[in-house]
Amino acid sequence: MTLITPAINSSRRKTHTVRIGNLYIGSDHSIKTQSMTTTLTTDIDSTVEQIYALAEHNCDIVRVTVQGIKEAQACEKIKERLIALGLNIPLVADIHFFPQAAMLVADFADKVRINPGNYIDKRNMFKGTKIYTEASYAQSLLRLEEKFAPLVEKCKRLGKAMRIGVNHGSLSERIMQKYGDTIEGMVASAIEYIAVCEKLNYRDVVFSMKSSNPKIMVTAYRQLAKDLDARGWLYPLHLGVTEAGMGVDGIIKSAVGIGTLLAEGLGDTIRCSLTGCPTTEIPVCDSLLRHTKIYLDLPEKKNPFSLQHSENFVSAAEKPAKTTLWGDVYGVFLKLYPHHLTDFTPEELLEHLGVNPVTKEKAFTTPEGVVVPPELKDAPITDVLREHFLVFHHHQVPCLYEHNEEIWDSPAVHQAPFVHFHASDPFIHTSRDFFEKQGHQGKPTKLVFSRDFDNKEEAAISIATEFGALLLDGLGEAVVLDLPNLPLQDVLKIAFGTLQNAGVRLVKTEYISCPMCGRTLFDLEEVTTRIRKRTQHLPGLKIAIMGCIVNGPGEMADADFGFVGSKTGMIDLYVKHTCVKAHIPMEDAEEELIRLLQEHGVWKDPEETKLTV
């Protein structure tokens, strides 16, 4: 069980208690971790074995895919086997497109997850051809209630919970017609369904508002929480960035979204959707809860920069950049220590910083500058760095802290081209207070992030959560990362990964890959790795690698191109929302993807980009 429990003066959003099997969630209970099996649900032995492994890793809740009646029936046997093993872990059934399966599996599972975009209405890619009148829209809501109410009544009668899980890319035809593919549409989709639950006095409901884009996900959860609270509906929230991807990249994407919301007091259960073995998700969830505990233990603090509406969200993302010495990009600077300047040759140090010492070419993930120790500012190796980077030492820059407000309005600050702000813990709150008070006097601000991490994953979670939250709010013009115990390449990977996932600076190819489930039609981890190797030199491009057509098209809404399993051994290729090549044999599909990129003018040969990986 997760050990993070609510403090007496917790800043967590107040939510009512929902029972899921033998477990209770809500603001009076600890935040729970969740994962999903990757086995065929009809393979009872393998599914039970994987659930047992997840329980051994302290996973609190497990979800299985239920495509149809066979999978729903399998859940009865799975639950029986779990009870026989003494495992009381709650079992959640994941439903898409098939209300009959939901009605059956409610007899066996502890919770039923439905997607309001495809529970009643077939998923429809919006083309603007169907027009809903006020009368036909009202009629479609009556049909929704008629089809959805039986599940609500059954869950209420049996004491089973439900999750209404909205996905950004799979909104219903009705919602798309009225709202488009927007935050407002996501919230409206959730409200339509909970209105039926409220009417029937059923409140064992949890919400999720998932997207593969952390900016959209954070904004949607913020807006839903605001709208629910305004109605007095204190429903719990399940947090997740859908299809986060593999390895550290997936961890960073999850932390930018989930960590930001946890620090604001939102969230009662969480899942990090990482491609690969589901047990790898739980340590990441636990780490996220540890890193955000400092915020949950504080009294509630409003975020003055919270982007509550999609309109504000868009305008903030496009805010004009300030004129800086490092141009119009969000800058990355590394603090170097004496061992960096004495343990490496100049050529080695340049390579670690992303510069080819022979050709002088820079990688997309090369920092704008470095901060050097004052005692080494005149060292020969520092002179070499000056040929490639902006080089500073701290005595050259006004260093502002929350405890030296008396100098914030000083001549030194007014005359400086930029300032450094050193935020103490809690980092997010201290930084927001600084910008709210205009402590930077309108100057470009570098946020200094100092930590003594020895572990790359822990550093990634902390930086993506705390620094990522500020990026989503549009704060600062650069970051100075002070991480003396980590290799410089790891620090740069984390820094630029956080910028990319906060939508601030696109420096690499982005992959939206699902975490695998019982619907997956090919080896996602292996195929994703191969596609990544062939396309990682195309910065700014978003490629989705999805295991099936049930979730695939709906959860890759943010992708430029999609590689989606259509049936065993076959792949469909997408451009945005449109399937352009169908049923391609798996052995030909990767070449066809490259050909598709070439046809759309986004392909470059690797040597043209000269990307240092």
Curated annotation (Swiss-Prot):
The keyword Coiled coil does not apply. It comes from the Bacteria. Binds 1 [4Fe-4S] cluster. One of its GO terms (biological process) is terpenoid biosynthetic process. This is 4-hydroxy-3-methylbut-2-en-1-yl diphosphate synthase (flavodoxin). Converts 2C-methyl-D-erythritol 2,4-cyclodiphosphate (ME-2,4cPP) into 1-hydroxy-2-methyl-2-(E)-butenyl 4-diphosphate. NCBIfam families: ispG_gcpE, PRK00694.1. Belongs to the IspG family. HAMAP family: IspG. Pathway: Isoprenoid biosynthesis; isopentenyl diphosphate biosynthesis via DXP pathway; isopentenyl diphosphate from 1-deoxy-D-xylulose 5-phosphate: step 5/6. [4Fe-4S] cluster binds at C514, C517, C548, E555. Disulfide bonds: none annotated. Its cofactor is [4Fe-4S] cluster. GO terms for molecular function: 4 iron, 4 sulfur cluster binding; 4-hydroxy-3-methylbut-2-en-1-yl diphosphate synthase activity (ferredoxin); 4-hydroxy-3-methylbut-2-enyl-diphosphate synthase activity (flavodoxin); iron ion binding. Its EC number is 1.17.7.3. It catalyses: (2E)-4-hydroxy-3-methylbut-2-enyl diphosphate + oxidized [flavodoxin] + H2O + 2 H(+) = 2-C-methyl-D-erythritol 2,4-cyclic diphosphate + reduced [flavodoxin]. Keywords: 4Fe-4S, Iron, Iron-sulfur, Isoprene biosynthesis, Metal-binding, Oxidoreductase.
